[in-house]
Amino acid sequence: MFRTMMNGKIHRATVTEANLNYVGSITIDSAILEAVDMLPNEKVQIVNNNNGARIETYIIPGEPGSGVICLNGAAARHVQVGDVVIIMSYGMFTTEEANKHEPKIVVLDEKNHIEMILPEEKTHTTL
């Protein structure tokens, strides 16, 4: 049996752009992608802290160090520039792998620079 587990998480990213006329996807600063082990074209879930929307799309890498978080195409309808979002990727693991799995989690500051890397998520954690 395989279990779907969170593999990477970008916490408190600030939306810098919303481009309705692009074909689709989310553009993410490639330096952030590297820190959380996310790849171009990987499926991600995006949760908007401002309006509660949850959407799925795929990643396009952005300029490293730019801080870009841009929702493209139809996904742009679910955000406004300045919204705070959580971006998560998932992987499928056997139960044995899942018990040993350690997701990569980064917390961003208001300019989308990595503020901290968390070794794990604890219950009742507030940032």
From Swiss-Prot:
Catalytic center residues: S25, Y58
Domain of life of the native organism: Bacteria
Positions bound to substrate: T57, G73, A74, A75
GO BP annotations listed: alanine biosynthetic process; pantothenate biosynthetic process
PTMs per UniProt: Is synthesized initially as an inactive proenzyme, which is activated by self-cleavage at a specific serine bond to produce a beta-subunit with a hydroxyl group at its C-terminus and an alpha-subunit with a pyruvoyl group at its N-terminus.
Keyword annotations from UniProtKB, A to Z: Autocatalytic cleavage, Cytoplasm, Decarboxylase, Lyase, Pantothenate biosynthesis, Pyruvate, Schiff base, Zymogen
Gene Ontology MF, one: aspartate 1-decarboxylase activity
UniProt cross-references to Gene3D superfamilies, sorted A to Z: 2.40.40.20
UniProt-listed Enzyme Commission number(s): 4.1.1.11
InterPro entries in the cross-refs: Asp_de-COase-like_dom_sf (IPR009010), Asp_decarbox (IPR003190)
Keyword set includes Ligase: no
Cofactor(s) demanded: pyruvate
Gene Ontology CC terms: cytosol
Keyword Mitochondrion assigned: no
Pathway(s) per entry: Cofactor biosynthesis; (R)-pantothenate biosynthesis; beta-alanine from L-aspartate: step 1/1
Subcellular location: Cytoplasm
Catalytic function, reaction form: L-aspartate + H(+) = beta-alanine + CO2
Function according to Swiss-Prot or TrEMBL: Catalyzes the pyruvoyl-dependent decarboxylation of aspartate to produce beta-alanine.
Assembly notes: Heterooctamer of four alpha and four beta subunits.
Family membership: Belongs to the PanD family.
Protein name as annotated: Aspartate 1-decarboxylase
Provenance organism: Listeria welshimeri serovar 6b (strain ATCC 35897 / DSM 20650 / CCUG 15529 / CIP 8149 / NCTC 11857 / SLCC 5334 / V8)
Source species taxonomy: Bacteria, Bacillati, Bacillota, Bacilli, Bacillales
